[in-house]
Amino acid sequence: MEAKAVSRFVRMSPRKVRLVADEIRGYAVNEALDILKFTNKRAIEPLTKVILSASANASVLNNKVDFNQLFIKKIYVDEGPIMKRFRPRARGRAARIRKRLSHITVVLSD
């Protein structure tokens, strides 16, 4: 049985979220949450929410699911749209700022 959860338009660079997502791929859900608890990155908040959402989806799909058996089968971070902003610079010029968004997908299996 597989349970899936997706968080879209997360206001964080996909490259930075992938650093943390790569660390927890393949771990059991409990172990992954423990690893995230002691990781000092901003990306742990959306990743934790998506993992908890996927585990809740697993309990809806199967009432007798054992949470100790669930592990992260797939976790990937895709690039979302880019918000373009401008910062004024000297002599009337402007510098473009690209604010990147992420789509986080987690698939749990038992």
Swiss-Prot record:
Disulfide-bonded cysteine pairs: these are: none
One GO MF term? rRNA binding
Superkingdom of the source species: Bacteria
Q: Matching Pfam families, A to Z?
A: Ribosomal_L22 (PF00237)
Coiled coil feature spans: none
Q: Which UniProt keywords apply?
A: Ribonucleoprotein, Ribosomal protein, RNA-binding, rRNA-binding
Q: Which GO terms describe its biological process?
A: translation
Which InterPro entries does this entry report, sorted A to Z? Answer: Ribosomal_uL22, Ribosomal_uL22_bac/chlpt-type, Ribosomal_uL22_bac/org-type, Ribosomal_uL22_CS, Ribosomal_uL22_sf
> What are the GO cellular component annotations?
cytosolic large ribosomal subunit
Return the similarity comment: Belongs to the universal ribosomal protein uL22 family.
Q: How does it assemble?
A: Part of the 50S ribosomal subunit.
Give the PANTHER family listed for this entry: CHLOROPLAST 50S RIBOSOMAL PROTEIN L22-RELATED, LARGE RIBOSOMAL SUBUNIT PROTEIN UL22M
Q: What does this protein do?
A: This protein binds specifically to 23S rRNA; its binding is stimulated by other ribosomal proteins, e.g. L4, L17, and L20. It is important during the early stages of 50S assembly. It makes multiple contacts with different domains of the 23S rRNA in the assembled 50S subunit and ribosome. The globular domain of the protein is located near the polypeptide exit tunnel on the outside of the subunit, while an extended beta-hairpin is found that lines the wall of the exit tunnel in the center of the 70S ribosome.
Name of protein: Large ribosomal subunit protein uL22
